[in-house]
Amino acid sequence: MLTHKILGLDVGSKTVGVAISDLMGWTAQGLDTLRINEELEDYGIEQLVTIIKENNVGSVVIGLPKNMNNSIGFRGEASLRYKELLKESLPDIEIIMWDERLSTMAAERSLLEADVSRQKRKKVIDKMAAVFILQGYLDSIQ
């Protein structure tokens, strides 16, 4: 059993998908999709701080999109910057970067298999990707 819950994040340029673990550390559930705007430097950090405090979160797992050759591209650099911004606001929270290659594709595939409409998929895809990221991490620590 964990002493704190773990948050999973899928960081994009317009949204951040948010997932949270149970206290056993076995399962990840979709929690929210935050709207952000990188161009205006609005990263939704205040919203995340509130979520973290309200949900007894001790660690945050941020998806790190890597290229297939293991290099880090533009989106990966943006995720690393997001980590630094979050660390400034929450210096006591453990932040883990997790290889998220293909997590959005896996989330999209599972939504397609569940016959979810395109409009509904657009609303939940980032949250689902965060679930895939967090579940991958949780499975690795079991």
Swiss-Prot record:
Organism name: Staphylococcus haemolyticus (strain JCSC1435)
Domain of life, per lineage: Bacteria
Cellular component GO terms held in the UniProt record: cytosol
One Pfam match: RuvX
Family as reported in the entry's similarity comment: Belongs to the YqgF nuclease family.
A biological-process GO annotation: rRNA 5'-end processing
Keywords in alphabetical order: Cytoplasm, Hydrolase, Nuclease, Ribosome biogenesis
Presence of the UniProt keyword Flavoprotein in the record: no
SMART domains, per the entry: YqgFc (SM00732)
Cited NCBIfam families: RNAse_H_YqgF (TIGR00250)
Designated name of the protein: Putative pre-16S rRNA nuclease
EC number: 3.1.-.-
Compartment(s): Cytoplasm
InterPro entries reported for this sequence: RNaseH-like_sf, YqgF, YqgF/RNaseH-like_dom, YqgF/RNaseH-like_dom_sf
Keyword field contains Nuclease: yes
GO molecular function per UniProt: nuclease activity
Enzyme class (EC, first level): hydrolase
Cited CDD domains: YqgF
UniProt function note: Could be a nuclease involved in processing of the 5'-end of pre-16S rRNA.
